[in-house]
Protein backbone atom coordinates (compact mmCIF):
# COMPACT_ATOMS: atom_id res chain seq x y z
CA UNK A 1 0.00 0.00 0.00
CA UNK A 2 1.27 3.46 -0.91
CA UNK A 3 -0.36 6.84 -0.41
CA UNK A 4 0.48 10.34 -1.56
CA UNK A 5 -0.78 13.72 -2.67
CA UNK A 6 -2.58 14.28 -5.98
CA UNK A 7 -3.06 17.20 -8.36
CA UNK A 8 -6.16 18.06 -6.32
CA UNK A 9 -5.17 18.83 -2.71
CA UNK A 10 -8.54 17.58 -1.43
CA UNK A 11 -7.60 13.99 -2.23
CA UNK A 12 -4.92 11.46 -1.36
CA UNK A 13 -4.21 8.71 -3.84
CA UNK A 14 -3.75 5.21 -2.42
CA UNK A 15 -2.33 2.32 -4.40
CA UNK A 16 -3.07 -1.18 -3.18
CA UNK A 17 -1.27 -4.01 -4.99
CA UNK A 18 -3.09 -7.33 -5.15
CA UNK A 19 -1.91 -10.53 -6.75
CA UNK A 20 -5.16 -12.32 -7.47
CA UNK A 21 -6.06 -14.49 -10.45
CA UNK A 22 -9.67 -15.02 -9.32
CA UNK A 23 -11.84 -12.27 -10.86
CA UNK A 24 -14.66 -12.91 -8.37
CA UNK A 25 -12.38 -12.30 -5.40
CA UNK A 26 -10.99 -9.17 -7.06
CA UNK A 27 -14.50 -7.83 -7.67
CA UNK A 28 -15.46 -8.55 -4.06
CA UNK A 29 -12.43 -6.63 -2.81
CA UNK A 30 -13.35 -3.67 -5.03
CA UNK A 31 -16.94 -3.71 -3.72
CA UNK A 32 -15.76 -3.80 -0.10
CA UNK A 33 -13.38 -0.87 -0.70
CA UNK A 34 -16.14 1.11 -2.43
CA UNK A 35 -18.29 0.82 0.72
CA UNK A 36 -15.75 2.78 2.76
CA UNK A 37 -17.01 6.31 3.39
CA UNK A 38 -13.87 8.14 2.29
CA UNK A 39 -13.30 6.22 -0.97
CA UNK A 40 -13.85 8.51 -3.97
CA UNK A 41 -13.06 6.08 -6.80
CA UNK A 42 -11.47 2.70 -7.49
CA UNK A 43 -9.49 2.04 -10.65
CA UNK A 44 -7.82 -1.22 -11.57
CA UNK A 45 -4.40 -0.70 -13.14
CA UNK A 46 -3.79 -3.68 -15.38
CA UNK A 47 -0.10 -4.32 -16.16
CA UNK A 48 -0.40 -3.72 -19.91
CA UNK A 49 -2.50 -0.56 -19.44
CA UNK A 50 -0.46 1.20 -16.76
CA UNK A 51 2.96 2.36 -15.65
CA UNK A 52 4.02 1.14 -12.22
CA UNK A 53 7.12 2.05 -10.25
CA UNK A 54 8.67 1.60 -6.84
CA UNK A 55 11.40 3.62 -5.13
CA UNK A 56 14.13 1.92 -3.12
CA UNK A 57 16.93 3.39 -1.00
CA UNK A 58 19.79 1.04 -0.07
CA UNK A 59 22.61 1.90 2.32
CA UNK A 60 25.59 -0.38 1.66
CA UNK A 61 28.80 -0.70 3.68
CA UNK A 62 31.77 -0.36 1.32
CA UNK A 63 35.50 0.05 1.60
CA UNK A 64 37.54 2.04 -0.91
CA UNK A 65 37.87 -0.87 -3.35
CA UNK A 66 34.25 -1.99 -3.09
CA UNK A 67 32.92 1.53 -3.66
CA UNK A 68 33.78 1.47 -7.39
CA UNK A 69 32.10 -1.91 -7.86
CA UNK A 70 28.88 -0.86 -6.15
CA UNK A 71 28.78 2.38 -8.16
CA UNK A 72 29.26 0.38 -11.38
CA UNK A 73 26.40 -1.98 -10.44
CA UNK A 74 24.25 1.03 -9.59
CA UNK A 75 25.02 2.60 -12.99
CA UNK A 76 23.89 -0.56 -14.80
CA UNK A 77 20.53 -0.29 -13.04
CA UNK A 78 20.36 3.49 -13.63
CA UNK A 79 20.58 4.06 -9.91
CA UNK A 80 21.78 7.28 -8.33
CA UNK A 81 24.30 7.62 -5.55
CA UNK A 82 22.53 10.05 -3.20
CA UNK A 83 24.97 9.90 -0.28
CA UNK A 84 28.62 8.97 0.13
CA UNK A 85 30.16 8.34 3.53
CA UNK A 86 33.60 7.14 4.60
CA UNK A 87 32.35 3.55 4.80
CA UNK A 88 28.98 3.58 3.05
CA UNK A 89 26.94 4.57 0.00
CA UNK A 90 23.23 5.20 -0.34
CA UNK A 91 21.82 4.15 -3.70
CA UNK A 92 18.44 5.35 -4.98
CA UNK A 93 16.69 3.11 -7.50
CA UNK A 94 13.34 3.46 -9.21
CA UNK A 95 11.70 0.78 -11.32
CA UNK A 96 9.59 -2.31 -11.33
CA UNK A 97 9.91 -5.01 -8.71
CA UNK A 98 12.10 -7.29 -10.83
CA UNK A 99 14.60 -4.49 -11.49
CA UNK A 100 14.91 -3.70 -7.78
CA UNK A 101 15.21 -7.38 -6.89
CA UNK A 102 17.88 -7.79 -9.59
CA UNK A 103 19.94 -5.01 -8.03
CA UNK A 104 19.61 -6.56 -4.57
CA UNK A 105 20.74 -9.92 -5.94
CA UNK A 106 23.90 -8.37 -7.37
CA UNK A 107 24.83 -6.53 -4.17
CA UNK A 108 24.02 -9.39 -1.80
CA UNK A 109 27.75 -9.99 -1.30
CA UNK A 110 28.05 -6.57 0.33
CA UNK A 111 26.68 -5.66 3.74
CA UNK A 112 23.33 -3.91 3.38
CA UNK A 113 23.07 -1.60 6.38
CA UNK A 114 19.58 -0.28 5.67
CA UNK A 115 16.90 -0.78 3.08
CA UNK A 116 13.70 1.21 2.48
CA UNK A 117 11.11 0.57 -0.24
CA UNK A 118 8.04 2.67 -0.94
CA UNK A 119 5.86 -0.01 -2.43
CA UNK A 120 4.35 0.17 -5.89
CA UNK A 121 2.51 3.21 -7.22
CA UNK A 122 1.17 3.72 -10.72
CA UNK A 123 -0.90 5.58 -13.29
CA UNK A 124 -2.96 4.40 -16.24
CA UNK A 125 -1.48 4.92 -19.70
CA UNK A 126 -2.98 7.38 -22.17
CA UNK A 127 -5.35 10.28 -21.60
CA UNK A 128 -7.81 8.42 -19.35
CA UNK A 129 -7.52 9.54 -15.74
CA UNK A 130 -9.33 9.77 -12.46
CA UNK A 131 -11.09 13.14 -12.33
CA UNK A 132 -11.41 14.84 -8.98
CA UNK A 133 -14.84 16.41 -9.43
CA UNK A 134 -17.58 16.81 -6.84
Tell where the protein language model's regions lie, with residue ranges:
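A conserved regulatory-domain signal marking ACT and ACT-like small-molecule sensing domains
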Residues: 1-134
